[in-house]
Amino acid sequence: MKLTCVVIVAVLFLTANTFATADDPRNGLENLFLKAHHEMNPEASKLNERCLSGGEVCDFLFPKCCNYCILLFCS
């Protein structure tokens, strides 16, 4: 019985804390995830960059080859 009361109080506390720390309590956490997605800079992500395959011409100072840049060609 005591454990059940403690669990109920803990769940109520965590729920109240979640809504109190959210920017917009009407939308809860859903709104936070949407804002975080729009605040990201997709151009800054290195995952969006395409690497050059073997045989393509590469830049010596800033190579974007999948492996290595040797004599201005990707290996």
Curated annotation (Swiss-Prot):
InterPro entries, alphabetized: Conotoxin
Superkingdom, taxonomy of origin: Eukaryota
Propeptide: 23-49
Keywords: Disulfide bond, Ion channel impairing toxin, Knottin, Neurotoxin, Secreted, Signal, Toxin
Molecular functions per Gene Ontology: ion channel inhibitor activity; toxin activity
Pfam family, one: Conotoxin
Family classification: Belongs to the conotoxin O1 superfamily.
Protein name per the record: Conotoxin Vc6a
Classification of source organism: Eukaryota, Metazoa, Spiralia, Lophotrochozoa, Mollusca
